Amino acid sequence: MKNLFFLLCILMGATLISCAPKAADEAPATTAADTTKAAPGPVEFADSHYTDIGRKSLSALSSGDIEGMMANYAENAVYRWNNGDSLAGKKAIHDYWMDRRTKLIDSLTFSEEIYLPVNVNKPQANEQAGVWLLSWYRTNAKYKTGKKMNQWMHSVMHFDANDKIDQVLQYRDNAPIIAATAK
């Protein structure tokens, strides 16, 4: 009886194994097309060290360290605002922010920062190819007038081949800034 039971178990096990779907023991054969890298899309994520550069730049501006902020700027950098104003050259940008931080702004903080580094491989409009850092942050400023300004801002930084910032585009609402700086 034990032998019959043992034989029955073996037959049932063999039946179950033979009816089970086969596992893929072999990897599918690769072709030459599988080993070549696909062309990059028009835009892809860039390295996170660009986020660090942007974060350090804002932190330096917040503390009044204009030299630290400018450490990652190219000599030919351009700083543009959405109202059409702009500054050309590292020295002009440095002097502008030095003047603002020493004569106009008492304190400046940034919070709720969001960063997105991207590499534009195929420009779709008038943007330049290369690495861009998109950032959004809440800006809180207290001016020498005693008035305060609080608003969300959006900045876009472009990096040259040496990882230096050569373009900044800043989108902000000028009305609260004008109101806070009025005497």
Model-derived regions, located:
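Low-complexity, intrinsically disordered terminal/linker segments enriched in charged
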Residues: 166-183
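A short gly/proline-enriched turn/hairpin at secondary-structure junctions
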Residues: 78-88, 103, 123
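Positively charged n-region of N-terminal signal peptides that target proteins for export
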Residues: 1-5, 21
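Sec-dependent N-terminal signal peptides
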Residues: 4-13
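C-terminal motif of bacterial Sec signal peptides marking the signal peptidase cleavage site
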Residues: 15-18
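Short, low-complexity N-terminal intrinsically disordered segments enriched in polar/charged residues
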Residues: 20-63, 67, 71
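Short, surface-exposed coil-to-beta transition loops
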Residues: 136, 149-154
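Surface-exposed, charged secondary-structure patches
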Residues: 97-145
